[in-house]
Structure formats: structure tokens, C-alpha cells
Regions:
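N-terminal Sec/SRP start-transfer signal
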Residues: 1-35, 330, 339, 427-467, ...
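Small-residue-rich transmembrane alpha-helices
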Residues: 300, 307-310, 319, 343-374, ...
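Short cytosolic juxtamembrane segments of multi-pass membrane proteins
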Residues: 411-427, 812-824
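C-terminal transmembrane helical bundles of large multi-pass transporters
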Residues: 530-531, 644-650, 660-768, 772-781, ...
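Juxtamembrane segments of multi-pass membrane proteins
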Residues: 60-74, 440-571, 576-579, 588-591, ...
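Interfacial "coupling" helices/loops that link adjacent transmembrane helices in transporter permeases
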Residues: 18, 304-344, 707-749
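Short, strongly hydrophobic transmembrane alpha-helices
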Residues: 20-45, 343, 351, 456-481, ...
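Membrane transport/envelope proteins' first extracytoplasmic loop
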Residues: 1-300, 312-315, 331-332, 362, ...
Length: 824
């Protein structure tokens, strides 16, 4: 009995006898370990991909943006940059012209495409290869080509590059002809992105859908010709030497521009101010926190389940351990057999866990390559992450086996021979039920008494299932919350005018100008309201947020925002904020804050100004950037009687798309989009995110089923003598099965309750903390639908209640005399 061969043979005998249980527990453990290992690589993948992509295209360190509506002669910004004291810190610089436009094209299947876009006029340069990506365009914020080419010369028509996700979403395949606002056309010869367009920044900011907006990269001189602004720019991008003081250089730039170009308002920002840069890095970090929480919960559920089930399996062998002790065997030798079973489960769990982890890894790798908007995606295998998770998975079953073995070999033989609930000293919490009037007779009360008779076992089973149910609840709740947010935005923006369109003009116009009259008098327009849309900032104390100011028309407007508190702005110094904006700034109706905005100082010249304004009220749109002011407030910006946008309702016989196409060719129009475009873009992004959530929820449900099955199987082994006694006294199979179902049902209800409470808490953290850091502009509505609650009930209560049915075959084939025999 001392040789390893003996123990291996005995271990093999146990494996053949209990292989379904060992494999099932191993699979439970493998699910937790594999998911933790697979999800653990996401942050490193995304950060490495971000670093490589931004580095390959030489992202700017500083950017100088002229105030909206301001344009500077070509070379003026470069001259100012070269005149600063630290000019030698600048290693590369490039001027640009960036303006909104309308894209009209035809998809590969003949479908017309009309969406807003953005002309990005940049310097051209020779193509070069960086990390396997063909890079072209300017030396700063270069264009990385995914397909095609971009040759700015030797072609009769202006050549352009479109965003690849936009082209894929709309079926545009280069070479293709695309028409821009004003009737000009360009030839799309390639698809690519630049650092500032990795995340689409359309009229809805980071919430613009990939297929609803695209930059159009063209040579700088072509952009000047297409937009009617010859020899003009409005943007400068610079790269500094490593280790340079960015803030000092930015201050020098502002002073020099103010000296050389008086009256010109500019904003100097750095890399961290790029919305796409912030989102990509913050999203990688916060998503990993979210995945770590879910992986931890699933791994915790697997750990609780494995610990409980292995412990109960070992304790089911206590009778055999007691017999061995009575025969004089040393406790340490009696411990070898159950520890070997723990080792078997550890090996099975790690092997299957690595397989599951690799499968999850491969799935996520493909998902990142398809959805990550980067020219370089690094998804190499993270062996360290796998080794760490595998080590955890290997230790869990060994520790789970060691605890009951230590307890088993420290008792007297007669105590070890006792089986079932009698091995629990004091009957657990069962005496408490003596003071609780339970309905029914002794048989009807047995399930409840069994649950409290061994509280440690019950708690472990409930916690294991509850932790995994919490993952399903919180993940499903995230989808519900996003959908509720989209629904609220759609309800707000489409009320009273479901077909409403928003027209962006290519510059500021007098409201009585022929250009505005041409748009409002078009046959495609039923009614229209002129308005002024200005980018600005609101500041209260140390808090500052970016907003989009919209003036409200007088009379009977096409659309007005809903007032959730206070009233619509009446005076020029009143603003109506989103509820989320008021919350972030810590203000309410009647309080004051500072408005930082551009103010016209002359044709094509704007300066930055500050105005104290009063909060007139709030509106319920979940996006925090829409801010509304009275029409008279245009004088605050130095633009009385001037407009640059219109809200309109299409003619009765026209659809929204038909009206877009009809308006796109009119002079002065930069873009036309549906009022619901923002919500539609968010819904499109939700579909991409939902695929990840659904897979994790499916894995969680499978793990709950495994926990329920294993718990039932162990219960059947542990209570075999009790069941045999019931059969000996004449109880039918259905009565014994009903007792098992009710007992599991009670634990399922407890697990579901814990899962719902924990899941709602996690959902609150995700919405109010995690998402708030990544997407502060979105006031996500916390929501948990009845469907998600039903899913939790099915995963918890349903799985636990139905699992005992799987033991019917074993109960029918039970040999009652052999089962009741104490010693063979």
C-alpha cells in the first residue's frame, strides 16, 4: 500500500467510477479559468495597438485650432510657430483646412448614400511603410491606408481617401466617385484613417456612427478650391521633441499668434485632448476593469462551486475514511486518495481551461481586428496571463480537497463513519426552524430543514450560483440601460416632428440672405427654422464641460426641447441645460455659471470671450452637450441676425432620405442629417458591443447549469442512504424526486436573489462610474428590463429546480439493500 503504483491504480479506479462528476467539476472550473484568461489579454492588446497606431502615423503633440468661422492665410500659423523662443523644439508641423461637408455617393448595390462628412485638406507627401502599414500624407497626423492608394498628382480629378469603416458600411469600393457639398466631386482612390479619425467625430462627436459620417482627405490646395477658401487654413498640427515642455510651447504659441494675428481666437490642445485618443485608452482601461469584475465573479462562482462540490464529494467518502481509521491506517495515508481526486479535477480544469481560454482569446482577437478602428492591431498570445490564471485554476481544487480531508482525518472513526447531514455537528441552523411554523407534515418540511441543516454547504452553493447569475444580470442590464438611453434620446429629438432634418450651412449667413431663402423656399421643405449653432464651454467652479449652443426660434418653431425643470430661456443671458450637464456642473435652475464662447471681431475673425449666464432650466436629453439659448443671444456672440443652421420638416410627399438628396446640391449647404442620427449611431454601436455581452451571458448561464447539475449529483450521492430509507418505507419515486426539486428550488431562489442584488450593484457601478469616465457626454439611464429579470430567474431558479430531474435514472436503478449496508 506504500508504493505509488498502488495509489495511481486506486486513483484510476476512482476516476472511472466518478468520471462524470470529475469532468463536470473540471468543466465548471475551466469555464471560470478560461474566461478569466481569455478576457485578461484585452487591455494589453488594445494599449499596444493604440501605441503602435498613434506612433506609426506620428500623432500631433500640439494642435492650434482657429475659432469656428476664422480662416488664416496659408503659412501664417507656421510663421508664428517658427517665431516662438522654443521653435527648435518643433520637429514637424503641418497646416490644414478642416470644414464640414455633405457626402453623396452610390453604394455597390446601387443604393444612394447621403451623409454628413468633413473635408480634411492636408499636405501631401510620398508613401512610406511603417510596421506593415502604408503611410502617406502630411508629416504630422499622417494617413494610414488600409486599401487602395492616394496619388495627389497625374489625375484629372481631385483624389481623396475615405474612412474604411464608412466605406464598408455603405458599400463604397474604390475607385469611386463621390459628390461633396456644392456639387463638386472627388475620386476616392483609397481607404484610410488618421490619428484624429480613429474614432469617428461627426456632428454627434464620438457618438457618430461609422457609416453615418466620414472624413474626406484631400490635398490642401484641393480643399481650398472645393470650399471656396483659396489660400486659407484654420488648423496647425505640431510634433515636439521627446521631453519637451508642451505647456510652455503652447503658451508661447498663443502669445505669438496674438502678436502676429491680432483679433484671431485660437485654441491650443495636446494629444490628450483628442477625443478618440482619450476614448481608446480610457476605454481599454475601463473595459478591462469591467471584464476583470465579470471574470472574477465567474471565477469566484467556479471556485465556490468547485470548493463546495469537491468538499461534499470528499465528505461523501468520510465513511470509507472512518472504516480505514478503524482498521488502523495512518491518517496521512488516508488523505492521499481524496487529494488525488482533487489533483485529477485540477488537471482536467486546467487542460479544459486553457482550451476555453484559447477559444475565447481567438474569438476576441477576431472581434478586435474587425471592430477596433486602428491601422495596426496587436493580438499576440499573452502567455503570462494564461500561466497566472492556470495556476489559480490548479490550486483551487487542491485547496478545496485539503479542507474536508483535514477535517475528516482529525475526527474519531465513529464520527467519520456518520454520513449525510449527521456529519454536521449540532444540525446546523435546523434548530432555529423549530420555532418557525412550516406548513405540511414532516416530509413537506424536509427540504427546508435540509437547506439549513448544513449552512456552509448551502451558502457555498448559493454563492457560487449567485455570483454567476450576477454576471448575467449586470451584463443584460447594460444592454437595457443603453437601449433606455437611446429610447429617451429618440423620444426627445423626434417629438412633434419625426421627419425633422438638421441642415448645416458652410458658413455664417444673414438670416435674410438669398442662400438661406433658397433653402427655406425649396420644394423639398415644408417648414423651416433658422438657428445659430456655436461650440462653447460651460464652467462652474473647477468643473468645465464642452457644449453645443443652439438658439431657439421665436413664434411657432418646428421643434423645441422639453423642459424638465424651470423654463425655456427668454433673456439673452439664459441657458437651458441637459439634466446630466446640470448635475456634472453642480447647478440648478436660477443659478449662474460662466459661458466660454467665440465672439466675432470682424469678417473671418473670432476671439474667445466669457459671459456670465443664468440656468433657466433643464431638458431630459441624455446627451449633455445640447444647450439652448433665446434667439436674441446671437448678439452675445457678435452675430446678430446671423445663422449657420436650420431645422426643417420635409415636404409631405418626400421621405427624409429623398429630402436629403434634394437639398444636398443647393449652394451654401455643408451637410444634411436626420435629427435622430445621434440615437441611430448609438444604436449601431450598441449592436457591436452586444455581441460580446451575449457571449459572456451565455457562458454564465452554462456555468450556472453546471453548478446546478454538480450540486444535484453530489446531493444524490450524499443522500443515497436517506433516499434508500424512504424507498424502504414505501415512498414512491415521485415523492423522493419532489423533495429534491423543492430543496434545489429554495437554493435557486436564494441564489437568484443574491445574483439580482449583486448584479444591480455592479450595473450601478458600470453606469455611474465606469461609463462616466469613458463617455462623460452621455448620461446613461440605468435600467433593468423584465426580460433580464426573467433571464436571471431562469438561470438561477430554473436551472437549480430542474437539475434533480437528471437523477431519476439513478434513483430508479438504486439497489436499496446495498445502499443501506454500512460496512461491506
Amino acid at each position: 500500500m506504500r508504493g505509488p503504483r498502488f495509489w495511481l491504480l486506486w486513483s484510476w479506479r476512482d476516476l472511472r467510477r466518478r468520471w462524470p462528476l470529475i469532468v463536470a467539476i473540471g468543466l465548471l472550473l475551466a469555464g471560470g479559468v478560461g474566461l478569466a484568461a481569455g478576457l485578461g489579454s484585452m487591455r494589453d492588446w488594445r494599449v499596444d495597438s493604440n501605441d503602435a497606431s498613434f506612433g506609426a502615423l506620428n500623432v500631433h503633440d500640439l494642435r492650434v485650432q482657429a475659432e469656428q468661422g476664422s480662416f488664416i492665410p496659408t503659412g501664417a500659423l507656421l510663421d508664428a510657430a517658427e517665431a516662438i523662443p522654443d521653435a527648435d523644439e518643433i520637429t514637424a508641423a503641418s497646416e490644414r483646412l478642416i470644414l464640414p461637408t455633405q457626402i453623396t455617393a452610390v453604394s455597390g448595390d446601387g443604393r444612394p448614400v447621403t451623409t454628413p462628412g468633413q473635408i480634411v485638406g492636408v499636405e501631401t507627401g510620398p508613401a512610406r511603410s511603417v510596421d506593415g502599414v502604408e503611410v502617406t500624407g502630411p508629416p504630422v497626423d499622417a494617413v494610414g491606408l488600409k486599401s487602395g492608394e492616394w496619388q495627389a498628382t497625374d489625375r484629372p480629378r481631385t483624389t481623396a481617401v475615405l474612412d474604411p469603416q464608412y466605406a464598408d458600411g455603405n458599400g463604397i469600393v474604390p475607385p469611386a466617385r463621390v459628390e461633396l457639398a456644392g456639387g463638386a466631386s472627388v475620386e476616392v482612390t483609397g481607404l484610410g484613417t488618421s490619428p484624429e479619425t480613429f474614432v469617428v467625430q461627426g456632428p454627434g462627436g464620438a457618438f457618430s456612427g461609422e457609416s453615418e459620417f466620414s472624413p474626406v482627405f484631400v490635398p490642401l490646395h484641393s480643399a481650398q478650391r472645393l470650399t471656396g477658401r483659396p489660400d486659407r487654413v484654420n488648423d496647425l498640427a505640431l510634433v515636439l521633441r521627446p521631453g519637451s515642455d508642451h505647456a510652455a510651447v503652447a503658451r508661447q504659441l498663443e502669445r505669438e499668434i496674438d502678436r502676429k494675428l491680432p483679433g484671431l481666437g485660437v485654441t491650443v490642445t495636446d494629444t490628450d485632448d483628442i477625443d478618440g485618443y482619450r476614448i481608446l485608452y480610457d476605454d481599454a482601461e475601463n473595459d478591462q476593469q469591467l471584464f476583470d469584475v465579470f471574470a472574477f465573479l465567474i471565477l469566484a462562482g467556479a471556485t465556490f462551486g468547485a470548493f463546495n462540490l469537491i468538499s461534499r464529494t470528499v465528505e461523501a467518502q468520510r465513511r470509507e475514511i472512518g472504516v480505514g481509521m478503524a482498521l488502523g491506517l495512518e491518517p496521512r495515508r488516508l488523505a492521499i486518495r481524496p487529494m488525488l481526486m482533487g489533483l485529477q479535477i485540477a488537471v482536467v480544469g486546467v487542460l479544459f481551461g486553457v482550451v476555453v481560454g484559447l477559444a475565447v482569446n481567438e474569438w476576441l482577437r477576431g472581434l478586435l481586428i474587425d471592430q477596433l478602428p486602428l491601422p495596426i492591431v496587436k493580438t499576440d498570445l499573452r502567455s503570462g496571463t494564461f500561466a497566472q490564471r492556470a495556476a489559480i485554476g490548479f490550486l483551487i481544487p487542491l485547496l478545496a480537497a485539503a479542507w474536508p480531508v483535514m477535517r475528516g482525518v482529525r475526527v474519531t472513526p465513529i464520527e467519520a463513519i456518520r454520513s449525510g447531514f449527521r456529519s454536521s455537528r449540532g444540525g446546523g441552523l435546523a434548530p432555529l426552524l423549530a420555532h418557525v411554523p412550516l406548513p405540511g407534515g414532516s416530509l413537506a418540511q424536509m427540504p427546508a430543514r435540509n437547506v439549513v441543516r448544513a449552512p456552509r454547504r448551502t451558502a457555498l452553493t448559493v454563492l457560487a450560483s449567485g455570483a454567476v447569475v450576477a454576471v448575467a444580470v449586470s451584463m443584460s442590464g447594460m444592454l437595457d440601460s443603453f437601449q433606455a438611453t437611446i429610447d429617451r434620446n429618440t423620444e426627445e429629438t423626434l417629438k412633434t416632428a419625426p421627419e425633422r432634418l438638421t441642415v448645416t450651412l458652410d458658413r455664417f449667413y444673414d438670416e435674410r440672405s438669398p442662400t438661406v431663402a433658397t433653402v427655406t423656399g425649396s420644394d423639398a421643405v415644408a417648414t423651416a427654422d433658422e438657428k445659430l449653432v456655436i461650440p462653447a464651454k460651460l464652467r462652474s467652479g473647477d468643473e468645465e464641460i464642452e457644449v453645443s449652443l443652439n438658439t431657439l426660434p421665436t413664434g411657432k418653431p418646428v421643434w423645441t426641447p422639453t423642459v424638465s425643470s424651470g423654463h425655456l430661456p427668454v433673456r439673452p443671458d439664459e441657458v437651458l441645460l441637459a439634466e446630466s450637464a446640470a448635475s456634472d456642473l453642480g447647478v440648478e435652475a436660477g443659478q449662474s455659471l460662466t459661458l466660454v464662447h467665440p465672439r466675432s471681431t470682424g469678417p473671418g475673425r473670432f476671439e474667445s470671450a466669457e459671459t456670465e449666464v443664468t440656468v433657466s432650466g433643464t431638458h431630459p436629453d441624455p446627451f449633455r452637450f445640447p444647450v439652448y439659448m433665446a434667439s436674441a443671444s446671437s448678439s452675445v456672440f457678435g452675430l446678430p441676425g446671423v445663422v449657420n443652421s436650420l431645422d426643417l420638416v420635409p415636404a409631405r410627399d418626400l421621405t427624409g432620405d429623398a429630402a436629403k438628396r434634394s437639398l444636398a446640391g443647393l449652394p451654401g449647404i455643408a451637410s444634411v442629417e436626420s435629427a435622430s442620427a445621434l440615437g441611430e449611431s448609438l444604436e449601431q454601436g450598441l449592436e457591436d458591443f452586444a455581441s460580446i455581452i451575449r457571449v459572456v451571458v451565455a457562458i454564465a448561464v452554462v456555468l450556472v447549469l453546471l453548478i446546478a447539475f454538480n450540486s444535484t449529483a453530489i446531493n444524490a450521492d450524499e443522500r443515497a442512504r436517506e433516499h434508500a430509507t424512504m424507498f424502504a418505507y414505501g415512498l414512491p419515486l415521485r415523492s423522493v424526486l419532489r423533495l429534491a426539486v423543492v430543496e434545489s428550488l429554495i437554493m435557486g431562489v436564494l441564489a437568484t436573489a443574491i445574483g439580482l442584488i449583486l448584479g444591480v450593484a455592479i450595473l450601478g457601478w458600470v453606469v455611474n462610474v465606469n461609463l462616466k469616465e469613458v463617455l462623460p457626454e452621455l448620461g446613461t439611464v440605468t435600467s433593468l428590463s423584465s426580460g433580464s429579470i426573467i433571464l436571471a430567474a431562469l438561470a438561477g431558479v430554473g436551472a437549480m429546480a430542474l437539475a434533480p430531474v437528471l437523477t431519476v435514472r439513478r434513483l430508479r436503478r438504486m439497489d436499496v439493500p446495498s445502499t443501506l449496508r454500512v460496512v461491506e
